[in-house]
Amino acid sequence: TTGIQLTASSSDVQLAGNLDLTATQTGQDSFASVLGISNDSGKMVVSGPTSLRLVTNAPFDAKGITASGKADMSFLGDVEIAVTGSASGSALYTTYRYDYSTQAGICPVISLGTDGKAVTLNSSGYGINNQGGSVSLTGQRINITGSTGVFVEGGGNENVFADVRFDGPTTINADKAIVTSIKAGEQVGASVTFAYNPTPINVPVTKESADSKVRGSVTGSSGTINKENAGSLAFYGDISNFSGVFNQKGGTTFLSEGAAGYFGKAQLAVTGGALVAPTLSFQKTGKLTLAG
């Protein structure tokens, strides 16, 4: 079901060279993913460049990398993942495993890239589909494309968290750039954090020169989007239907003109840096908190 998969109770894999895999999915059970860990304590470290390509036909649920349970995966070189042909496919997919003894979800941890590297996720469906787990992307360039760029879903009675963190200049190009969700119970959340900290600091005058760009809609009835550190971030597209929390903690964030360009339903907390917008407009559910 998978190109490479770890399923034992304890499995460690270390690859010092390049990892280059290409697969074609011809049926629903042909490939669950190109590379995966689904066990209690599996670890994988790839120090060289990683290139994964999967071609499939709709409606197969194709995945480039998949991780569940207590999986721990690190990719230290350039990372390129392409999953094409499936609207429900994912370049990167994570999910929790329910532990009956603790009555809580066990979530995987994945890191892609390091300083100076490039991370590219390209999918006909989801760039990142995080339904439980911690995902971090680091590099001098991070690009995500798909029908949905980043999907995060946490919470519920299983105490599941779903977090995605970008430590590098990031571009998300997708009709649905960011979608956040929390299951029933809302005990633990879902978050997307832009944390690029450039040296030297780039202080853009216009949104076109921002370090990171989100090109597409931002939606979700819950969840959190964080802007941290000194980098800059620009939103393009409709963000008016995001009803979660946006935390402006550092750097500069640019919004767009018109009602679609504002977090009109969200709760905004500005505790550092600058939030740049032509005007601010809130609906009944909107709220603005300023510090300082």
Range-by-range predicted roles:
Residues 2-9, 28-39, 43, 60-70, ...:
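Glycine-rich beta-solenoid repeat tracts in large extracellular/virion proteins
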Residues 14-24, 45-56, 74-85, 107, ...:
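Right-handed parallel beta-helix
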Residues 15, 114-117, 177-267:
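Extracellular repeat-rich scaffold modules on cell surfaces
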Residues 31, 59, 86-89, 144, ...:
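Surface-exposed loop/turn positions within long extracellular repeat scaffolds
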Residues 48, 61, 88, 106, ...:
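Cysteine-rich, disulfide-stabilized extracellular repeat modules
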